């Protein structure tokens, strides 16, 4: 009887120890991709946000552009509390690493979004994007962002594959001074020449465009001297053209 009691006590002791034994540690690889997982919570898997949300795609954008935006969020030129908190204590060299990581991702774009814009509104948006408005000294979007609107090197982003609401919000932020870039702030200057209906039109048209296969930022080409002059852009290091 005593031996049975001893055996029962031993089993109880062993099972109790097993119940409270610490779990084996989970080993997470210390890679840049792993450290940047928090970015995916908002920007989507691998930074390829969908077209029906507010947050932008960051995968495949020019590294110099992404780096400049990370600096802008960290240093207060762009206002977003989540981004500011995430970047507050990050060094410049680490921001460059982050930018290079996302710039190197080559991922497919989602299909074009649906739209409720009228044909007339879309036609107006297409004219602004492709031709600009000389009467208001508005160059075409394609003059800076590339003929295919996929961005130009080293630091001008593409405009395709972005949600309409995000595009409108950014134009509004430039207009009201909520968003800033390194002086001279060309987008602030140009966006203030847009009427609200124009901003809606060009955003609706851009969000509706299909993405050409293999779309990449390109080397900028010389622009025609007959169009509106392009202002200097401090964030891209480009002189007036």
What are these regions (language model features)?
Residues 56-61, 144, 157-165:
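Short cysteine/histidine-rich metal-coordination sites, predominantly Zn2+-binding motifs
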Residues 15-23:
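Long, low-complexity intrinsically disordered segments that are proline/alanine-rich
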Residues 2-16:
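Bacterial N-terminal signal peptides
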Residues 5-7, 38-41, 232:
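The N-terminal extracellular segments of secreted preproproteins, especially immediately downstream
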Residues 22-36, 45, 81-153, 173-241:
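Flexible coil segments in periplasmic/lumen-exposed cytochrome c-class electron-transfer proteins
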């Amino acid at each position: 009887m005593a031996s049975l009691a001893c055996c029962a006590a031993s089993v109880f002791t062993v099972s109790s120890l097993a119940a409270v034994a610490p779990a084996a540690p989970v080993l997470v690889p210390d890679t840049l991709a792993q450290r940047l997982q928090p970015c995916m919570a908002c920007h989507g898997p691998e930074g390829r946000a969908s077209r029906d949300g507010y947050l932008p795609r960051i995968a495949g954008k020019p590294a110099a552009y992404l780096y400049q935006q990370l600096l802008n969020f960290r240093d207060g030129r762009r206002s977003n509390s989540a981004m500011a908190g995430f970047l507050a204590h990050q060094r410049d060299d680490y921001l460059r690493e982050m930018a290079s990581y996302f710039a190197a991702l080559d991922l497919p774009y989602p299909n074009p979004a649906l739209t409720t814009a009228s044909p007339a509104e879309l036609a107006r948006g297409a004219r602004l994007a492709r031709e600009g408005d000389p009467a208001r000294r508005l160059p075409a979007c394609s003059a800076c962002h590339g003929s295919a609107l996929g961005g130009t090197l080293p630091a001008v982003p593409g405009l395709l594959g972005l949600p309409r609401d995000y595009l409108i919000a950014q134009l509004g932020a430039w207009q009201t001074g909520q968003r800033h870039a390194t002086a001279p702030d060309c987008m602030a200057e140009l966006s203030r020449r847009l009427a609200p209906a124009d901003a809606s039109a060009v955003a609706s048209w851009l969000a509706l465009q299909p993405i050409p296969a293999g779309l990449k930022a390109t080397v900028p080409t010389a622009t025609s001297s007959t169009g509106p002059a392009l202002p200097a852009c401090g964030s891209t290091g480009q002189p007036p053209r």
